[in-house]
Amino acid sequence: MAVARSSRSAAATPRSGAEIRAAFLSFYEERGHKVMASASLIPEDPTVLLTIAGMLPFKPVFLGQQKRPAPRATSSQKCIRTNDIENVGRTARHHTFFEMLGNFSFGDYFKQQAIEWAWELSTDLFGIDPKHLVVSVFREDDEAEQIWRDVVGVNPKRIIRMDEADNFWASGPTGPCGPCSEIYYDFNPELGDEGIDLEDDDRFIEFYNLVFMQYNRDAEGTLTPLANRNIDTGLGLERMAQILQKVPNNYETDLIFPLIQAAADLAGVDYHQLDDAGQTSLKVIGDHSRAVTQLICDGVSASNLGRGYILRRLLRRVVRHGRLLGIHQPFLVTMGQASIALLKDAYPSVIERQEVILAELQREESRFLETLERGEKLLADVLESKPKQISGAQAFELYDTYGFPLELTQEIAEEHGLDVDLAGFEQAMEQQRQRAKAAAVSIDLTLQDAIDQVAADLNATSFEGYDLLVQSSSTVQALLVNGEAAASASDGDVVQVVLDNTPFYGEGGGQVGDRGLLVGDGPDGNGLIVVIEGVSRNRGVFVHSGRVQLGRLGVGDVVHGQVDRACRRRAQANHTATHLLQAALKQVVDEGIGQAGSLVNFERLRFDFHCPRAVKPEELEQIETLINGWISDAQSLEVNEMAIDQAKAAGAVAMFGEKYADVVRVVDVPGVSMELCGGTHVGNTAEIGLFKIVSESGVAAGIRRIEAVAGASVLAYLNEREVVVKQLGDRFKAQPGEIVERVVALQEELKNSQKALTAARSELAVAKSAALAVQAVAVGKHQLLVARLDGVNGDGLQGAALGLLDQLGDATAVVLGGLPDPSDQGKVILVAAFGKAVIATGQQAGKFIGAIAKLCGGGGGGRPNLAQAGGRDGAALDAALNTARAELKKTLG
């Protein structure tokens, strides 16, 4: 019996991306599904860099590791995939960022209901004529075929059996798995039902995948039925938009095309008039702009590792394809703004994170433009020799010396019909690793080897220092004297001591090891004192480093550990303050901030965190106030051990990439901070005393650092500042309260002097340029003036060029170049100003001056009528101007 379709007017059929998304979720909500918000692109699953599928947030539920949120759920999940990045823009349907609409059953309904609803959604809600639909089933899934044929009523000729590679889903080599069934849209049903080939991408597009999780696969590959069978489906929003909006590809839907149009406007081109290469570049920019906006919004910062590298790669591809279209000025911020405008209704978080998104785009583009100019120049030199292949050594030089990504070298090579010797590249990379390894300076390798050997032969040390600072007794398990294993040590010996249990904290989690004493009777009863200067860990074994101050120490001796209380108090105050700092940063700056590293010692603390911009002074002030408020609240800390899943469910903050045991230690400042942490802490926030931020700075791309002091160290810091203030007061002959006023007055004087100097330079440029007009020469129907003008800055040179253009008329091309500071050959400025009649010949000032600037080791660009570029080789300026003159004579003549 076929499933009935209710009539639905064409006007009511969803068309826009937003309508399709809302209609899908409403359809399943009406059928008892709980609507779930999209999860972050940064998954909780540590085995996956990014959220790559709609089911990924539910994977722990499917695997039985987590309680189901409801028997039925539906979502629109944002996803990122980069495994087919080279196909983005070249095919009709490959993307990096996409939205996956899905409906899920956790042990509730199963195959027949999922199939019936999928068909009803496609044909009734979305109004697709069944003659345009084809379904696939797993070759052994007779049940699914029977449902499609006998229950839904699909023509048997339009039910295609597929192999395991296409229609069988598995979470891994073992575990839950099952067959799947897919619905395809047929763009050309008039071609008939005979010999249907679903691999024909021009005719068919798969838009809905239904996974029937009904088996468990064991290590031998045996399939056994699951007690609770599940449904996992995915419908591609972009693909459905293409179908319903009747456009040639996903890129021309309202989900992406506004970004393509924004990029086309920046490039001054018409998408529909471009060749395939030009359209591909616009599609890449449109696709990647959505992806990078969402990645940054969810807390990813560009870097050379993991998901940060994926973001950096996408950003650099956008810039690269922009340049192929003639966009030489920075434009990522503009594309970011367009992306935010397009995404904000579905994802309001992009508005909340707008400042962070745009700052990261601007910072990363600025860095890459410098890299790109250097790398493209070298690569152009390589290509000029017309090689058959880019050698591995050349690709590695681009990567190692110029920071030019290998993927970009491959792309540019492909554009010229070449490939890259990847084996040679890897060989050069390995040689570099070996050179770095050989050059590395390692302190006392023999000692480290000895410690490794000792640690390998012993059981882990029992740490008792959370509760004890003075120990009743412990036994010496092993001893190193001056770097070598020994049975005993005496006065003056430098030692490494391993005990069976210890109150000393071993360095870890950013916190330094404790200091203190080991005391005992000694073998001769005359006493023993070992001064411990640091404690490290090696495979769970605590190694106490120090010097024997009195007596003799031997393996098997009983000693008593005494931790330096003052040092421990300072370290644990700084450690708890670090937790408060992270909590305050999340509250004041951005909830998505994550720890990148930390150092907690006896004097101060240092906290590194992912953030694309500097923390503002007013934010630092807020953070200080917030932390000191929490200190004043005198809150008692709660420390508990619990299962890792329980800790995460409770909201405990974990450091990404860190490996944790099944049972973890959770340090909780109630209502303020909860973190997984093995370090030592104060019992009450009041013990910290006071907190003061010393500095905020950048340490790497997307990584900021705050250094701070707490407790008694704050007083020492303030005393140092007081000395500095006194010295400044003496220097300016001012009281402390007058120093700022004096400095502001001096700055104003300097500013006025700089303005006067700039004005004088501009006047000089105008005066000099008036005299240059006589150097103009007639070239056909045009006037051409190419001249050198040193001692003038960029604004002055532009003003001079425009003045000459006004003086000589609309049929004039003016090119000026010079050294702003004649004594500095490392900075060149070039300006081009073209009249309308010159532009009408096809010349554009921006493209022209950018090409000339490359001759001076630089680059730049601008508008068709006025553009400025820079260079780094003053010695090449005259030759560059001669080239400009010759090129324009040839073009305008």
UniProtKB/Swiss-Prot annotation:
Any single GO CC term annotated in Swiss-Prot or TrEMBL for this entry: cytosol
Main location: cytoplasm
Binding site for Zn(2+): H575, H579, C677, H681
GO molecular function: alanine-tRNA ligase activity; aminoacyl-tRNA deacylase activity; ATP binding; tRNA binding; zinc ion binding
Record's cofactor remark: Binds 1 zinc ion per subunit.
InterPro entries: aa-tRNA-synth_II/BPL/LPL, Ala-tRNA-lgiase_IIc, Ala-tRNA-ligase_IIc_anticod-bd, Ala-tRNA-synth_IIc_core, Ala-tRNA-synth_IIc_N, Ala-tRNA_ligase, Ala_tRNA_ligase_euk/bac, DHHA1_dom
EC annotation from Swiss-Prot or TrEMBL: 6.1.1.7
Transmembrane segments: none
Cofactor section: Zn(2+)
Pfam family, one: tRNA_SAD
Catalytic reaction(s) noted: tRNA(Ala) + L-alanine + ATP = L-alanyl-tRNA(Ala) + AMP + diphosphate
Gene Ontology biological process terms in this record: alanyl-tRNA aminoacylation
SMART domains reported for this sequence: tRNA_SAD (SM00863)
Localization in the cell: Cytoplasm
Record function comment: Catalyzes the attachment of alanine to tRNA(Ala) in a two-step reaction: alanine is first activated by ATP to form Ala-AMP and then transferred to the acceptor end of tRNA(Ala). Also edits incorrectly charged Ser-tRNA(Ala) and Gly-tRNA(Ala) via its editing domain.
Domain-level remarks: Consists of three domains; the N-terminal catalytic domain, the editing domain and the C-terminal C-Ala domain. The editing domain removes incorrectly charged amino acids, while the C-Ala domain, along with tRNA(Ala), serves as a bridge to cooperatively bring together the editing and aminoacylation centers thus stimulating deacylation of misacylated tRNAs.
Family designation: Belongs to the class-II aminoacyl-tRNA synthetase family.
Protein name per its UniProtKB record: Alanine--tRNA ligase
Species annotation: Synechococcus sp. (strain CC9311)
